[in-house]
Amino acid sequence: MSCCGGNCGCGSSCKCGNGCGGCKMYPDMSYTESSTTTETLVLGVGPEKTSFGAMEMGESPVAENGCKCGSDCKCNPCTCSK
């Protein structure tokens, strides 16, 4: 998935918007060392997801006014009313 400032999706005037999470879809998992704070991160616990909606069918997950996010995070095709 391409990213546009962390947000990939078509907004007004076929510009990049806040449609999907893009690069910022997952929380920051960077490592920082601290002697006073303890943090526990648990991964992989939860019910199994059996359906992925539009992603499963190969469609773009974001479409607004006929716009879909292209490979370089420019809306393609652009059929928005401007």
UniProtKB/Swiss-Prot annotation:
InterPro entries: Metalthion_15p (IPR000347). Mainly expressed in flowers and first leaves. Induction: Strongly up regulated by heavy metals. It holds the Pfam family Metallothio_2. One of its GO terms (molecular function) is metal ion binding. The keyword GTP-binding does not apply. Keywords: Metal-binding, Metal-thiolate cluster. Belongs to the metallothionein superfamily. Type 15 family. Metallothioneins have a high content of cysteine residues that bind various heavy metals. This is Metallothionein-like protein type 2 B. It comes from Solanum lycopersicum. The lineage of its organism: Eukaryota, Viridiplantae, Streptophyta, Embryophyta, Tracheophyta.
